């Protein structure tokens, strides 16, 4: 199974892997959004991205599900019920693939799962239910991002409300410039030293590229070149994935990394 991309349902593919064979699981699963819709083909991706970037379009996203919290409609009791149902369905989906990931991970194997700042707690709970225990939340700081939601002053001004100016600077959400990485670990075999000796994993490489003790905030990551031929809309920078691999996985030919949602393959290249 090493150095191979398998296509199929993540849970079903992971079920074919040997027990206690994986040194780390590093993955960037769907965030419970629908930014590019259900068709993951390059033409559809390109069409929607071009629409988003067009100065003639005022629409940022279309067909938004309740999971994004950007969906329109009246915010009545049923709206909030559907938001709750949606996120619990997502948590259950994470739990399903995490159960198999737990089986194939070695004792002490770290699991790093990217997710949005709003939903990563549900991912952590799902993985804890599967048997992993929480270690940290790593922060990938991007130094970018656009505000999403309602500009109250602008909305009131559209309606001709005389109080519009008094609400200048008030918005329904903050500008998001970071992504969460839920960091969990399969329980150790008695202690750290036994686990490392028997399985080659269990501790973190805590020296960052500058030689300092690494923190749980990862920043100053260069972006990949725009003309690298990668049309995948949510690809993570290679430098980011390489740093995470360096932090979590001791270099060894016996250490295999699992990425159940490999996207354009950045984690695979970094490994």
Q: For each of these PLM feature ranges, what is it?
A:
Residues 1-271:
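S-adenosyl-L-methionine-dependent nucleic acid methyltransferase catalytic domains
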């Amino acid at each position: 199974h090493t150095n191979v991309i398998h296509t199929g349902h993540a849970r079903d593919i992971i079920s074919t892997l040997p027990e206690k064979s994986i040194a780390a699981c590093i993955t960037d699963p769907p965030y419970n959004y629908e930014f590019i819709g259900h068709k993951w083909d390059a033409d559809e991706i390109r069409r929607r991205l071009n629409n988003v970037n067009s100065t003639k379009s005022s629409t940022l996203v279309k067909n938004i599900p309740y999971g994004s919290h950007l969906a329109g409609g009246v915010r009545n009791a049923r709206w909030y019920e559907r938001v709750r149902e949606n996120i619990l369905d997502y948590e259950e989906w994470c739990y399903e693939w995490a159960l198999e990931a737990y089986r194939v991970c070695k004792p002490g194997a770290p699991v790093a799962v990217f997710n949005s700042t709003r939903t990563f707690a549900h991912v952590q709970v799902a993985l804890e239910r599967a048997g992993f225990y929480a270690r940290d939340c790593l922060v990938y700081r991007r130094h970018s991002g656009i505000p999403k939601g309602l500009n109250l002053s602008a909305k009131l001004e559209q309606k001709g409300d005389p109080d519009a100016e008094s609400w200048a600077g008030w918005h329904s959400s903050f500008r998001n410039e970071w992504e969460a990485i839920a960091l969990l670990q399969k329980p150790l075999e008695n202690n750290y030293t036994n686990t490392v000796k028997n399985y080659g994993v269990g501790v973190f490489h805590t020296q960052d590229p500058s030689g300092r003790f690494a923190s749980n905030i990862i920043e100053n990551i260069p972006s990949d070149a725009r003309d690298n031929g990668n049309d995948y809309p949510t690809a993570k920078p290679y430098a980011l994935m390489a740093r995470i691999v360096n932090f979590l996985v001791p270099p060894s030919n016996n250490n295999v990394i699992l990425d159940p949602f490999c996207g354009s393959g950045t984690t695979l290249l970094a490994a």
